Amino acid sequence: GDKSSRQLAAKVARFMTKRGPWGSTAEGPSMADSYEHARWQGHFHWFATGVVGLADYATTTNDVQLLRYLKSYYEYSRQFGIVRIGFFPAVVTPLAQRRSASQKIYGGTGQNDEGCALVDMLDIALMLSEAGVGDYWDDIDSMVRNHLVEHQMLDRKRLKHIVSHSPKSEMRPEINNTENVIERNIGAFASCAEPTKMYAWWTMCCNANMMLAIHKAWDATVRFDNGLAQVNLLLNRVSPWVDIDSHLPYEGKVVLRNKQAERMSVRIPLWVDRTALRCEVNGRKVPIRWLGRQLQVEDLQPGDTVTITFPMVETIEKHTERTYNTTFTCRFKGNTLIDISPRPKEFSLKRISSDDGKFTELNKEMGYPLYQRDHLKANQAPTKEVTRYVHHH
């Protein structure tokens, strides 16, 4: 790239990693230097969006020292909230301070997430994983399958219910429009959510960023170079090199329809029992060869069909979100959350602020329930016929 641009980027990166904003007074042992180990506190998205830029710079220039630092940042930051579902609190501070501030400002002690923070963490995890700094593909898979897609508003009936039970807003014709508002916003992504329900409220940054994050995860599902198809995520994806038909989370089955690959390297999630995995090429069982978590399939021809099967694993897990003072019981199939409890009807907060600086008083009828996923408890994947688009790289 351009030498002067690289020099400027290096200066910005050095400035952004000065001791000032880094270092945390959060709870925990203080024998480790918080600055040197990339500890931080404050507004999650405000901080993480800068780290996205640092990660882009570090992976582009192979700044190894900065990459190690960002690895520490990510592994520290993923401890807040519930990474297994992609829930990250909007603000990270010492617990007592956070609870006190939330109670004073919002009338409750919980801490909602922000979609942009989830996007930042996914983006950082993607860049670090693809650079070989860490293996965070299971984190990415969990974020995508859970809170990322759950942030999208698709239920017209529920949105109408929320509108009918919400305080009336002052309409300003020069900036507000009341024409088909719900219909025009189906598919938009809400800005804020608790672990079990969303606020039907959003700002445009979260809306745009979450759409972009879905594309980035889709794009990273498979990479291709010199005859090798690298499958990173077991998600449905059509590509010029291989089509992926994923039956997850209904059943442990993935079908890879080869177009150009001579060999494939397929990352198998941590929850899969590798000893129980089976692989067939054109219906013929082939020997299992591993490279870490990567299943190696070789000597492929265009038109070959690779079928990978394994037992679907269902787990019950406990995850504590301390600002809510709640331990959630989470039922997973693989990395997909299919149920969660408790599901309180009331919001943790009594009011929420908006971009105009005003507050909206909340009531239990204004919640948009998440994880209405009884259909995912079935053991056979539904199918439908669609026209698929192939992205040209």
Q: What is each model feature region?
A:
Residues 257-270:
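Surface-exposed beta-strand/loop patches in extracellular or lumenal glycoproteins
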